[in-house]
């Protein structure tokens, strides 16, 4: 098991996109996308299953999470503080948490994918 944290010059969205592409190319499946938001007196967490979602039509999970996060911001005044990706594979998993601040902090937790996590962290442009 490995826990690693790095700061990057990338935006939260760029970091999430890179993480999604990198870990999926390394054989992990995106299981869940997460948005963690804070209000003045509490918090909200939005979780959306990874991949495609079917409702009135077929939607990408990233689009659904983005829309729900924007609704929580505009309707309720909650502000996103972090975003997350949860990946699974037959041997283990990887969790990626990305802060919504400058510089962006990326926290990586791994079970059985330590080498890939280190390689991904090393590829990020450092803040």
Language-model segment annotations:
Residues 1-38, 43-46, 51-62:
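Terminal, regulation- and interaction-focused segments at domain boundaries
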Residues 19, 23-27, 68, 72, ...:
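Hydrophobic, Leu/Ile/Phe/Ala-enriched alpha-helical segments that form helix-helix packing faces
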Residues 55-57, 66, 74-127:
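Beta-strand/loop substructures that line and gate deep hydrophobic ligand-binding cavities in soluble
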């Amino acid at each position: 098991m490995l826990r690693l944290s790095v700061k990057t010059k990338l935006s939260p969205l760029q970091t999430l996109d890179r993480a999604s592409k990198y870990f999926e190319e390394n054989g992990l499946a995106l299981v869940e996308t997460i948005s963690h938001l804070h209000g003045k007196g509490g918090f909200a967490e939005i979780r959306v299953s990874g991949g495609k979602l079917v409702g009135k039509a077929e939607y990408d999970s990233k689009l659904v999470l983005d829309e729900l996060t924007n609704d929580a911001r505009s309707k309720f005044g909650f502000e996103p503080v972090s975003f997350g990706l949860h990946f699974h594979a037959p041997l283990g998993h990887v969790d990626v948490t990305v802060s919504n601040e400058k510089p962006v902090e990326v926290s990586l937790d791994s079970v059985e994918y330590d080498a890939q996590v280190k390689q991904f962290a090393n590829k990020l442009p450092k803040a």
